[in-house]
């Protein structure tokens, strides 16, 4: 049995759907989120639990061979914080899985995760990677770079909806291996019960590294209209949720070119071109 934690989110939901399509027996951790209803109808078994409640996690992992977690506090509210979920909550889940002798623990981290990072989210991801490596379980760390669907939709889609210029940081010329969520799902599915994925960190990027300015230019080609751009300095205000400003600034402070040939060869996955994602996100009107 496979336990998916974070199934109510985009990535976790897609992974759950993929596992069910493969005929896998899937249990999903839920707090009664309506977003899980379709997955339950499709065959996933719900179990009530919370990353902040160790006792509930002990029940959730009973009889489980593989844990896959995509959960984070980025879109949570109430008493959920990066510390309570991404640090303490993940440690609770690791402890419960280790105590239950889970055979493989698949953790969704981030390409830029680093325990020494000044950014709390990236630091907690990095610290969780370290804890998982010490756990004694076979582990797989998925470290995807920036999701096209999420960030293109937020940065470009918001501007289109509001009839405003696209706002970019700096000169928008630093290159990044933006990746489609579906490609991360493919790697996750290929990693389950796969010794080639055991005890390793898998960086996941897209088929090419492009700058934000290039992204806007190519999206404009896809939708068949010009897109004007406003550039603001690092630290300037952005028309996207303030919690995401830090990552947007960071994309103009370093480049991230993720080599993918070895991942493609090892796991048999293909990578989705930028234009294909843009066509889904921004259909011509």
Question: What spans do the regions from the language model cover?
Answer:
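N-terminal Rossmann-like NAD(P) cofactor-binding module of classical short-chain dehydrogenase/reductase
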Residues: 61, 65-68, 86, 106
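Conserved residues in the N-terminal Rossmann fold of short-chain dehydrogenase/reductase
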Residues: 48, 231
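Short, conserved SAM-binding segment of the class I
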Residues: 89-92, 96
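Structural motif
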Residues: 1, 65-66, 104, 249-255
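Oxidoreductase cofactor-interface core, primarily capturing Rossmann-like NAD(P)-dependent enzymes
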Residues: 1-25, 31-41, 46, 52-55, ...
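A hydrophobic C-terminal alpha-helical subdomain
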Residues: 222-223, 233-285
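Short alpha-helical oligomerization interface
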Residues: 76-89
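Glycine-rich, N-terminal phosphate-binding loop of Rossmann-like dinucleotide-binding domains
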Residues: 70-71, 109
């Amino acid at each position: 049995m496979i336990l998916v934690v974070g199934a109510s989110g985009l990535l976790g939901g897609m992974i759950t759907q993929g596992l069910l399509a493969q005929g896998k027996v899937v249990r999903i951790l839920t707090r009664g989120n309506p977003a899980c209803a379709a997955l339950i109808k499709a065959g996933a078994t719900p179990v009530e639990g919370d990353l902040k409640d160790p006792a509930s996690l002990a029940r959730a992992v009973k009889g489980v061979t593989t844990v896959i977690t995509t959960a984070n506090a980025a879109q949570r509210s109430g008493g959920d914080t990066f510390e309570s979920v991404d640090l303490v909550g993940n440690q609770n889940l690791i402890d419960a899985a280790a105590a239950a002798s889970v055979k493989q623990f698949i953790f969704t981290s981030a390409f830029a995760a680093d325990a020494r990072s000044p950014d709390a989210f990236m630091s907690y991801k990095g610290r969780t990677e370290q804890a998982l490596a010490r756990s004694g379980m076979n582990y797989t760390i998925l470290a995807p770079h920036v999701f096209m669907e999420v960030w293109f939709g937020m940065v470009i889609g918001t501007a289109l909806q509001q009839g405003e210029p696209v706002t970019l940081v700096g000169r928008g010329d630093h290159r990044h291996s933006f990746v489609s969520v579906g490609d991360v799902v493919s790697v996750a599915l290929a990693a389950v019960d796969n010794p080639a994925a055991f005890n390793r960190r898998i960086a996941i990027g897209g088929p090419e590294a492009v700058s934000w300015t290039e992204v806007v230019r190519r999206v404009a080609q896809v939708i068949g209209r010009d897109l004007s751009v406003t550039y603001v300095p690092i630290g300037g205000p952005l028309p996207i949720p303030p919690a995401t400003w830090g990552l947007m600034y960071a994309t103009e402070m370093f480049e991230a070119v993720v080599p993918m040939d070895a991942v493609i060869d090892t796991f048999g996955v293909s990578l989705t071109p930028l234009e294909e994602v843009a066509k889904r996100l921004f259909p011509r009107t």
